[in-house]
């Protein structure tokens, strides 16, 4: 039996030709900014919709406790961050906060400048997958 979150993710992408991810990047002003990015998907019939190949350098898994808060920091490299369990609030310098839940994908590119804050949500631990990109 599928859970409600899985069903809502499937319903969100049903019949669409793109997948939405959140990008965080360093602006010319030295601050991090958010951008919503649509990843184009090609319909391949029975095998589903598939994007172009993104080249990665491996995979890292991470778990954090539900009380973490990491003050302003930069992404250590350009990478995809895929939330597996739990949620994270990401805050940028102007006070904007994005909440990323399970199944959310972040393209982290704010490797310079002030960076962003990451904090746990509702005391829940979180697990995620890092995919460093070329």
Annotate the PLM regions.
Residues 63, 93-111:
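Short acidic-glycine-tyrosine-enriched beta hairpin
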Residues 49-53, 69-75, 91-92, 98-99, ...:
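Short histidine-centered beta-strand/loop micro-motifs
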Residues 38-47, 57-75, 110-113:
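Conserved short histidine dyad/triad with adjacent acidic residue
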Residues 105-111, 121-134:
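A short hydrophobic beta-strand segment most commonly corresponding to one strand
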Residues 63-66, 73-90, 129-132:
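Short, conserved beta-strand element in jelly-roll/cupin
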Residues 7-25:
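Short acidic, Pro/Gly- and aromatic-enriched capping/linker segments at domain boundaries
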């Amino acid at each position: 039996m599928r859970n409600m979150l899985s069903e809502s993710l499937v319903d969100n992408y049903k019949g669409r030709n793109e997948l939405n991810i959140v990008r965080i990047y360093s602006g010319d002003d030295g601050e991090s900014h958010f951008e919503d990015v649509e990843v184009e998907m090609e319909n391949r019939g029975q095998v589903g919709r598939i994007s172009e190949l993104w080249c990665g350098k491996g995979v890292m898994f991470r778990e954090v406790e539900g009380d973490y808060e990491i003050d302003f920091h930069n992404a250590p490299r350009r990478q995809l961050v895929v939330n597996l369990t739990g949620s994270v609030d990401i805050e940028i310098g102007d006070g904007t906060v994005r909440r990323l839940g399970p199944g959310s994908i972040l393209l982290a590119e704010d490797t310079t400048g002030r960076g962003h804050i990451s904090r746990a949500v509702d005391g829940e631990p979180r697990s995620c997958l890092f995919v460093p990109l070329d």
